[in-house]
């Protein structure tokens, strides 16, 4: 009985250590700030620093995710995507998914 309690305690302790980092890493709103998306696309996803930059607020989640993947891989290398290419190596697949989900919830 003691071994089971000990194993349970160790497992729960591990969850309390790992879980906050996982949740934080997948927080799309926080990532939008820390990965500097807001610098070019604006805090609201609509107020861009240049008129030619896309307004991304409310964009379809699947579309946004695919665009992020294409920019990262180099499959999309037209227009302003070259500016993002230098940043995308810092964004994991999981973070891209969280960002796409967050952007889709922004008011267009």
Give the positions of each predicted feature.
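Bacterial N-terminal signal peptides that target proteins for export
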Residues: 2-11
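N-terminal (or domain-start) structured segment
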Residues: 34-35, 80
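Short pre-active-site segment immediately N-terminal to redox-active cysteine/selenocysteine motifs
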Residues: 35-36, 44, 60, 95
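Axial heme c-ligation environment in periplasmic c-type cytochrome domains
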Residues: 49-57, 72-106
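The canonical Cys-X-X-Cys-His
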Residues: 36-43, 99, 103
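Electrostatic cytochrome c docking/interface patches
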Residues: 16-33, 47-52
């Amino acid at each position: 009985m003691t071994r089971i309690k000990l194993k349970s305690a160790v497992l729960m302790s591990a969850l309390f250590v790992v879980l906050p980092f996982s949740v934080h890493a997948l927080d799309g709103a926080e990532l939008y700030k820390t990965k500097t998306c807001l610098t070019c696309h604006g805090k609201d996803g609509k107020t861009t620093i240049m008129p030619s930059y896309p307004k991304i607020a409310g964009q379809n989640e699947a579309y946004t995710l695919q665009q992020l993947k294409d920019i990262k891989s180099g499959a999309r290398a037209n227009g302003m995507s070259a500016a993002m290419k230098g940043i995308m190596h810092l964004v994991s697949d999981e973070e891209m998914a969280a960002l796409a989900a967050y952007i889709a919830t922004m008011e267009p």
